[in-house]
Regions:
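Conserved alpha/beta-domain cores
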Residues: 1-169
Length: 169
């Protein structure tokens, strides 16, 4: 509906305004202007809403936290002209759903998962960009490696064919 589109547009503009103000404050304080990429989490949102934000409001990157939802929304999001990232916990049996589709997988929390992503990527003839997940608070309820193990974890992931380690989460 037009009302829903206006609501989405207003909310998006508000978020962009807050980001712009925060960047300006940081620049005034430090003299450093750091680029920011806004990722719209599409959790529970219909594909039409994400497509509208991309097509009409300027959102460039969306992220989904469930592999099945990612697959269901993929065509609409890509048709709107944006990047689609996977931002949730990923099980090895769901990897195939994302290969060749996800511009970036944010949540690689084990070497075993990275190896499966690499294997599936090679089979599809693509390279998959990933972020290694660090559990900075060492919380049992969170995924990722302990900070003390991060360097070795990243080195191991970076050596896996079919994967490009793009950073950490």
């Amino acid at each position: 509906t037009d009302e829903r589109k206006q609501e989405l547009s207003n909310h998006y503009a508000s978020v962009v305004s807050r980001i712009t103000a925060a960047r300006a404050r940081r620049y005034a304080k430090t003299g450093v202007d750091t680029p920011v990429t806004l990722l719209g989490a599409s959790k529970t949102m219909p594909a039409e809403d994400i497509a509208f934000l991309m097509r009409d409001c300027g959102l460039r990157v969306a992220g989904e936290n469930r592999a099945q939802e990612f697959a269901a929304k993929y065509d609409d999001v890509i048709a709107a002209g944006g990047e689609y990232h996977f931002i949730g916990h990923l099980q090895t049996n769901k990897v195939k759903t994302l290969i060749g589709r996800a511009a970036l997988i944010h949540s690689v929390d084990s070497v075993h998962l990275a190896q499966e992503i690499g294997r599936q990527s090679l089979a599809a003839g693509v390279t998959t960009r990933v972020l290694g997940e660090v559990n900075s608070g060492c919380e049992a309820s969170k995924s990722g490696v302990a900070p003390a193990d991060a360097r070795a974890f990243f080195a191991e992931i970076a050596a896996i064919p079919g994967i490009e380690l793009a950073g950490m989460m």
